[in-house]
Amino acid sequence: MSGKITDFFEKKTTTTIDEAENKDNDKELTSTTTTTTTTSTTSKKKVAAAPKKKAAVASKKRKHESSDEETDKEEQQNDDDDDGEEKVENNNNNKKLKNEEKSEEINSTITDNNYYDDIENYFTDKQWKEALSGEFGKAYFKKMITQLNKRYSSKEKPIYPPKNEIFSAFNYAHLEDVKVVIIGQDPYHGKGQAHGLSFSVKKGVSPPPSLINIYKELETDIEGFKRPLKNGFLEPWARQGVFLLNAVLTVEEATPNSHKDFGWADFTDAVLKILSKQDQPIVFILWGGFAQKKEKLFTNKNHLVLKSGHPSPLSIKHFIGCKHFSKSNEFLKSKGIEEIDWKITE
């Protein structure tokens, strides 16, 4: 822009000088036709006046050049100011972007940790919550819960049981009131079945094959037991101190053992170790090879360990006749502990 202004003033100045010189030449011709003396006098005046006119023109030109320089400086200053403002704006934008990114990161962390925070609400029993507080803070547990939170949130494939029922087994009886522990492998993977208790299904859901076989064994083992045909809800056992624990507490729909590598085994092993250290006598019932691998965790001689095949139809012949229910009651009675009423009504 400054270059255009300078060109304009230079052209204007040149035009002014040319016009002044043309006027002087016209006057000079007019004076010559009058008289020689006048011509001489006029010529002298012109000679004397010419330097003044040229000086005035030069001065005017210098003013224009000075004005151009000031204009250039002003424009440069404006450009510098614009650059400065742009830098400030860029810095502000960068800060804003960083703050937004940090906010997103915090929000993401909060989102990931929501499930972990909710666990405080899922554990309603204070004794269990206190006993397991050390596990909640471990890296494997936080990683597992974060992973589970994403799986539950994505809804690509249903996860069972619902989040608020994962720890149901811990909320039916205080740690000090546990009498019998029955270890399962992982939850039922059919819709509407699992609710946090091993081998149990929700109200209104027909008993699965393994539970039907458990009922069959009870019919031959416990006098007066009548097998319910439509009720597989084992809550009455849980309320009496039967701890129905799966080694893995979650599963994807129609995909058994899908969460076996999530870290649940570390958690439930810690649970079993805590139970093993309890002074009150406990019966540990281990059905099948998977559950029997946990036997090494029970080093307390106060407890009783019972083993047999799994109640699944695939291994039923190694399960039927084990009499684990009557044996559990005999042990509890011998220790002065109230026996379990194994009855399940329709």
Swiss-Prot record:
PANTHER family: URACIL-DNA GLYCOSYLASE (PTHR11264:SF0). Residues 43-64 have a biased composition (Basic residues). Its EC number is 3.2.2.27. Residues 20-29 have a biased composition (Basic and acidic residues). This is Uracil-DNA glycosylase. Pfam families: UDG. One of its GO terms (cellular component) is nucleus. Its main location: mitochondrion. Excises uracil residues from the DNA which can arise as a result of misincorporation of dUMP residues by DNA polymerase or due to deamination of cytosine. Disulfide bonds: none annotated. PROSITE patterns: U_DNA_GLYCOSYLASE (PS00130). GO terms for molecular function: uracil DNA N-glycosylase activity. It is found in: Mitochondrion; Nucleus. CDD domains: UDG-F1-like. It catalyses: Hydrolyzes single-stranded DNA or mismatched double-stranded DNA and polynucleotides, releasing free uracil. It comes from Dictyostelium discoideum (Social amoeba). The gene is uglA. The active site is at 186 (proton acceptor). Residues 1-105 are annotated as: Disordered. GO terms for biological process: base-excision repair, AP site formation via deaminated base removal. Residues 30-42 have a biased composition (Low complexity). Belongs to the uracil-DNA glycosylase (UDG) superfamily. UNG family.
